Amino acid sequence: MAGGKAGKDSGKAKTKAVSRSQRAGLQFPVGRIHRHLKSRTTSHGRVGATAAVYSAAILEYLTAEVLELAGNASKDLKVKRITPRHLQLAIRGDEELDSLIKATIAGGGVIPHIHKSLIGKKGQQKTV
């Protein structure tokens, strides 16, 4: 039996598995995003390895941005829980996020806005 493997443990130390999310320093699951990207493509599931890492990083950044703004909105209203209303105020208050996220947020309410032409000047009074 010469020339075969020396056994199950041939002197190499077993290393612990490191996920792609940990390698990239991300919280979002790179492997799961890669699987979903592969299932959505028409070219037989050919997606580059870095595409999933890049997509996960983008999603994580946008989520952190929205949550930070929504947290600020909830702090301003002196509550400890982020509601859909706080998400709506955060997204519609930021010009770039507003142009990116055009979806209707259920339970978000409306953004208060009065057109400038409807606001009367301080010196003018309405006469009856």
Curated annotation (Swiss-Prot):
List the residue ranges of the region (Required for interaction with PWWP2A): 120-128
Q: Which residues carry this modification: N6-lactoyllysine?
A: K12, K14, K116
Q: What is the effect of changing T83I?
A: Decreases interaction with VPS72. Almost abolishes interaction with VPS72. Abolishes interaction with VPS72
Q: Where in this protein does the record put region Disordered? A: 1-25
State the residue spans of region: Required for interaction with INCENP: 1-17, 93-103
**N6-acetyllysine carried by residues:** K5, K8, K12, K14
N6-methyllysine occurs at which residues?
K5, K8
State the compartments where it is located: Nucleus; Chromosome
Where do the record's region annotations for M6 cassette lie? 89-100
InterPro entries given for it?
Answer: Histone-fold, Histone_H2A, Histone_H2A/H2B/H3, Histone_H2A_C, Histone_H2A_CS
GO CC terms of this entry: euchromatin; extracellular exosome; heterochromatin; nucleosome; nucleus
Q: Position(s) of the covalent cross-link Glycyl lysine isopeptide (Lys-Gly) (interchain with G-Cter in ubiquitin)?
A: K122
Select a single GO molecular function from the record's annotations and give it.
nucleosomal DNA binding
PTM remark? Monoubiquitination of Lys-122 gives a specific tag for epigenetic transcriptional repression.
Which intervals carry biased composition (Basic and acidic residues)?
A: 1-12
Query: What top-level branch of life does the organism fall under?
Result: Eukaryota
- Which Gene Ontology BP annotations are present? cellular response to estradiol stimulus; chromatin organization; heterochromatin formation; positive regulation of transcription by RNA polymerase II
Q: Which UniProt keywords apply?
A: Acetylation, Chromosome, DNA-binding, Isopeptide bond, Methylation, Nucleosome core, Nucleus, Ubl conjugation
Protein role: Variant histone H2A which replaces conventional H2A in a subset of nucleosomes. Nucleosomes wrap and compact DNA into chromatin, limiting DNA accessibility to the cellular machineries which require DNA as a template. Histones thereby play a central role in transcription regulation, DNA repair, DNA replication and chromosomal stability. DNA accessibility is regulated via a complex set of post-translational modifications of histones, also called histone code, and nucleosome remodeling. May be involved in the formation of constitutive heterochromatin.
Q: Which family does it belong to?
A: Belongs to the histone H2A family.
Q: How does it assemble?
A: The nucleosome is a histone octamer containing two molecules each of H2A, H2B, H3 and H4 assembled in one H3-H4 heterotetramer and two H2A-H2B heterodimers. The octamer wraps approximately 147 bp of DNA. H2A or its variant H2AZ1 forms a heterodimer with H2B. H2AZ1 interacts with INCENP. Interacts (via M6 cassette) with ANP32E; leading to removal of H2A.Z/H2AZ1 from the nucleosome. Heterodimer H2BC11 and H2AZ1 interacts with VPS72 (via N-terminal domain). The interaction of HZAZ1 and VPS72 is enhanced by VPS72 phosphorylation which is promoted by ZNHIT1. Interacts with PWWP2A.
Q: What is this protein called?
A: Histone H2A.Z
Q: What is the lineage of its organism?
A: Eukaryota, Metazoa, Chordata, Craniata, Vertebrata
